[in-house]
Amino acid sequence: MDVDQLILFVFVCCLSSRFADAYDPVDPNGNIIINWDFQSIENVYTVMVSVHNHQLYRHIEQPGWRLSWRWAGNEIIWGMTGAEATEQGDCHRIRGATRPHCCEKQPVIVDLPPGTPYNNQVSSCCRGGVLSSLTQNNRTSTAAFQMVVGGFRRATYHDGDRGPALPSRFGVGVPGYSCSNATKVNATSSERFLLPRARAPCAVTWQVTCTYSQFMEAASPTCCVSLSSFYNSTIVPCPRCSCGCPRSPTAPQCISEGEKPELPAGDGEAVAPVFRCTDHMCPVRVHWHVKISYREYWRVKVTITNYNQVKNYSDWNLVVQHPNLRSLTQLFSFNYQPLIEYGTLNDTGMFWGIQYYNEMMLQDGNVQTEMILKKDKSDFTFSGGWAFPRRVYFDGHECVMPPPDQYPLLPNGGPDSRVSAAQLIASSCLLLPFIFLIM
């Protein structure tokens, strides 16, 4: 293999790993869909743009989505309801008494804040760009806005129809997401996004699909897991340098216990992340504690700690994979919904806070719950680390787990009583010949 072939091979491997990382086994069909539903197409066109979060557990938090695209020609946004462009652009070439809303070749559109006047709203708008996950609240997992566009040229679509030329280079302005090109699909109805005074049918629909990759969002993880149990005094901490090393040049600023972070001078000034100094340097830690074993049940305590000193996590969620979740009997202080159910398989569930109680995890704070699970006689055991989760995700990010060989062991390093009994019988059988020889 020559040098050129080797370089090509390495490039293909890296490219393949990047696309493989975009696949999510917990939510394989999760994505964000952007629809452009055209209500009229004449000299100008009126279109309802809707953003649908079809992800089971990933949500879009503040500062929210920032939808962008590149026009095919010299399009002009004359008016917009339910959102606004961040820049008006150069509109000097436009003559007339009416000023356009935006003349940018590549506009960036943001949602309006809550409390926007009624006459500048459409349904599902004005939440500051925040989108809930489907599991937490499917009613707030969609955003929409309406705009009037002129100066467009017509083009022929793949099905032979003619209409406005398709834009390109779509983005949602949220780290980790990449978007496809727009395609013409079967017309959908946009009536549910309109206020009663402005209902209209949909003539043509464009659609864009955006997918998430944790590899694209961050170079390092953002959460880690620690473990403990009632049967072992050892507390297994998050692996060292899980999200970065304390004294690394690329590590965010950290402060010791009792110190206060420096706040920005102005309200609009961006706040750099400031963490509490730890060996793992993760902004979030999830601690799983096996608390009590009853005759037919066992109890687990989960604590989520926010080490970020300048950020609150609103509408947070936690996804856990464990085979005994199918037998979850009682849960305290959190909401819960199974995510993966195939026949008898039900090993992945999502936890999130209760509204007005703990749906927001405050900076340098924590939230916690306890759950009671029924022991399944077919596979329940405390040996081999079975009682600890297989995977943990916080706010859509997979957390770093400790190595399995560091999990808390049963007393004397032994397995559970059933295995110990088997070992005792086997040992006795091996000793029998020696006993007979002695006799």
UniProtKB/Swiss-Prot annotation:
Involved in determining the orientation of cell expansion, probably by playing an important role in cellulose deposition. May act by recruiting cellulose synthesizing complexes to discrete positions on the cell surface. Glycans are attached at N138, N181, N186, N232, N312, N346. Its main location: membrane. It comes from the Eukaryota. Transmembrane segments: none annotated. One of its GO terms (cellular component) is plasma membrane. GO terms for biological process: cellulose microfibril organization; plant-type cell wall cellulose biosynthetic process. It is found in: Cell membrane. It comes from Oryza sativa subsp. japonica (Rice). The keyword Membrane applies. Residues 413-439 form a propeptide. Belongs to the COBRA family. Keywords: Cell membrane, Glycoprotein, GPI-anchor, Lipoprotein, Membrane, Signal. This is COBRA-like protein 7. Disulfide bonds: none annotated.
